[in-house]
Curated annotation (Swiss-Prot):
Belongs to the universal ribosomal protein uS4 family. The keyword rRNA-binding applies. This is Small ribosomal subunit protein uS4c. NCBIfam families: PRK05327.1, rpsD_bact. Transmembrane segments: none annotated. Keywords: Chloroplast, Plastid, Ribonucleoprotein, Ribosomal protein, RNA-binding, rRNA-binding. GO terms for cellular component: chloroplast; small ribosomal subunit. Residues 89-150 form the S4 RNA-binding domain. GO terms for molecular function: rRNA binding; structural constituent of ribosome. It comes from Narcissus odorus. Residues 15-41 are annotated as: Disordered.
Amino acid sequence: MSRYRGPRFKKIRRLGALPGLTSKRPRSGSDLKNPLRSGKRSQYRIRLEEKQKLRFHYGLTERQLLRYVHIARKAKGSTGQVLLQLLEMRLDNILFRLGMASTIPGARQLVNHRHILVNGRIVDIPSYRCKPRDIITTKDKQRSKALIQNSIASAPREELPNHLTIDSFQYKGLVNQIIDSKWIGLKINELLVVEY
């Protein structure tokens, strides 16, 4: 199954807020999901919606998500927490969290078009897993810097997670450590995803 390219607001209305999917917001409260209309929700539906939230927020295919769950099960610690740490340490997500891109799909495009360097080397794989002490910069080309500058200028000033630091004048970001669970940007019950 390929990456989702359809209408994003339909997904937001059904699943709730997905900050990584789009930077736009619904105009009225009626655009968000209506809990009265949906009736009784089965356990299967609850688990499926949590999984879909994760998929659409991070822009993953079904196969990619299953691969991440498989890796998380093998690792030590809580499978759900390890899964979220793996997803949060992806290069496209880190660019989004640093404010270098307005959405995760926008960050994917920056990486695919070779505008991003990690530790001085071009990385064109959005799923690249960043490690502590990785330095993320842009190419020296004017076009690359202009794209990042526009994103940083237009991004709303949210509190930066403590595992990241950014120097907005040099267009440079630094991964300090692996993310702590309280800084994860999506409100989700990860245990339901693992159970699904």
